[in-house]
Amino acid sequence: MDKFWWHAAWGLCLLPLSLAHEQIDLNITCRYAGVFHVEKNGRYSISRTEAADLCQAFNSTLPTMDQMVMALSKGFETCRYGFIEGHVVIPRIQPNAICAANHTGVYILTSNTSHYDTYCFNASAPLEEDCTSVTDLPNSFEGPVTITIVNRDGTRYSKKGEYRTHQEDIDASNTTDDDVSSGSSSEKSTSGGYVFHTYLPTIHSTADQDDPYFIGSTMATRDQDSSMDPRGNSLTVTDGSKLTEHSSGNQDSGLNSTSRPGGKPRVPEWLIVLASLLALALILAVCIAVNSRRRCGQKKKLVINSGNGKVEDRKPSELNGEASKSQEMVHLVNKEPSETPDQFMTADETRNLQNVDMKIGV
């Protein structure tokens, strides 16, 4: 009996987990020239093989580049990477720093990650915008998974079934990649860091190596005026920003300018020469000021020694006897501001200015 309750408890614990694995939410957008975007469970969780199966379940196929460009010209844009035939792309009409690296047009990503959203193409859809609710997954087959279709207007339709034909996609149903960005509040996604990797050859390596090649075009000039980007990793056909301003309803607020941030502005050569001349003039002015101060800073000092001068400056007495001599010496000195000993220039102007009493004796 205890063993029965033990197994029952384990079954109740595992039941929510099994139910979680059997729930799939598919968020879809309006159709533009038959092309629409599908997001699974609010995150990047669709492999390339599952993308083909999912489009097949919607009675659709992966769109080609031409079909994606046509949808773009009708106003279709998102901020989510998704599979098309042979590429992973974002269609952009309005530039945004967090969407397609601020590019416009069909932005093509080359990356080594494996899970994204997907784009699908329904050939029977109207050529213009079509936002009617999708209520069925016509080509799904029997299965235990609860599949819920979430339309842009919020309506939801659920059914039991399965659309995946590859076992590895079923086994890896919980494997997801990090999100790149969110296009609008209606797209259930979380913003996060993402590094773009380019595999195209470049002549000069640059600091921003997050630029896969880029195609922006209109239907009229799609096959003309192809040119290579100066950095070697962008292919521009025409400017996708010339397309109609009408979009799929998920345009972002606070859009940035279409111009890409370039390198640092170069300093004009004439400004460098002018700065050098000013610096040289300043150095010369300082040198002249210091030299003038040294010349004008000389001081003349008059020193009068009364009675006791230096020994070498004294004159030996020519007088005999006990008479003492007193000498006054006047020294005219050039006082230099340096710390060297004072040098004196001595001039004796008076000698023996005394009355000598002589004793006359025999």
Swiss-Prot record:
Residues 293-311 are annotated as: Required for interaction with EZR, MSN and RDX and for co-localization to microvilli. Keywords: Cell adhesion, Cell membrane, Cell projection, Disulfide bond, Glycoprotein, Membrane, Phosphoprotein, Proteoglycan, Receptor, Secreted, Signal, Transmembrane, Transmembrane helix. Residues 34-122 form the Link domain. Phosphorylated; activation of PKC results in the dephosphorylation of Ser-326 (constitutive phosphorylation site), and the phosphorylation of Ser-292. The chain crosses the membrane at residues 270-290. It is a single-pass type I membrane protein. Its main location: membrane. The modification Phosphoserine is found at residues 292, 306, 317, 326. GO terms for cellular component: apical plasma membrane; basolateral plasma membrane; cell projection; extracellular region; lamellipodium membrane; macrophage migration inhibitory factor receptor complex; microvillus; plasma membrane. Residues 1-22 form the signal peptide. Residues 233-260 have a biased composition (Polar residues). Residues 291-362 are cytoplasmic. InterPro entries: C-type_lectin-like/link_sf, CD44_antigen, CD44_antigen-like, CTDL_fold, Link_dom. Residues 158-190, 211-263, 307-327 are annotated as: Disordered. Residues 226-269 are annotated as: Stem. One of its GO terms (biological process) is inflammatory response. Cell-surface receptor that plays a role in cell-cell interactions, as well as cell adhesion and migration, helping them to sense and respond to changes in the tissue microenvironment. Participates thereby in a wide variety of cellular functions including the activation, recirculation and homing of T-lymphocytes, hematopoiesis, inflammation and response to bacterial infection. Interacts with PKN2. Interacts with TIAM1 and TIAM2. Interacts with HA, as well as other glycosaminoglycans, collagen, laminin, and fibronectin via its N-terminal segment. Interacts with UNC119. Interacts with PDPN (via extracellular domain); this interaction is required for PDPN-mediated directional migration and regulation of lamellipodia extension/stabilization during cell spreading and migration. Interacts with RDX, EZR and MSN. Interacts with EGFR. Interacts with CD74; this complex is essential for the MIF-induced signaling cascade that results in B cell survival. The lectin-like LINK domain is responsible for hyaluronan binding. This is CD44 antigen. It comes from Cricetulus griseus.
